[in-house]
Amino acid sequence: SICRLLLALGIGDVILVDRNGILAPGEEWMNPAQKEMAEITNKERLHGDLKTAMKGRDIFVGVSAPNIVTAEMVSTMADDAIVFAMANPTPEIMPDEAKKGGAKVVATGRSDFPNQINNVLVFPGVFRGAFDVRASDINEEMKIAASKAIAALISDEELSADNIIPKAFDKRVGPAVAKAVAEASKRAGVARIWVK
């Protein structure tokens, strides 16, 4: 789901990794869903482990297991790398270690660090917007609209390496996401009623 959204947003290449290694065509251990994703990702057809996958990359998005990334691995990424280490309660790498490795922006799923990425920012507004127009589906266009609505709540003046996303209980988020999702559902043709 994260990968499909990143691709829909126009991210040039995504490399997926699970405990067995990088998803790449021809890997015998992959299940059918992984085989499908391997066909649309990993343009360089890399094989190997997480360490290999991170070399030279701009962004790491982790939603897997605690303490699987090291500062050394982050140091092999592109300059000013972005690290979203969202395993809970212990992220793939702690923020101070990621920054020690050279990460410019670090986010986790935890409220005790800057840039908490929490699904509470998304779900209430997505469902409110979809319910308001009786959407028949929640599609990629609606998800993209939600992500852009959340991002727009941080002004250029507020934006910094430690402030890339609104706080979990920011009262502006739900209504902004709901409005964006409702509008996107209309554009996508899945709204069954029109609400002003």
Q: What are the roles of these predicted feature ranges?
A:
Residues K35-K104, R110-D112:
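Rossmann-like adenosine-cofactor binding region
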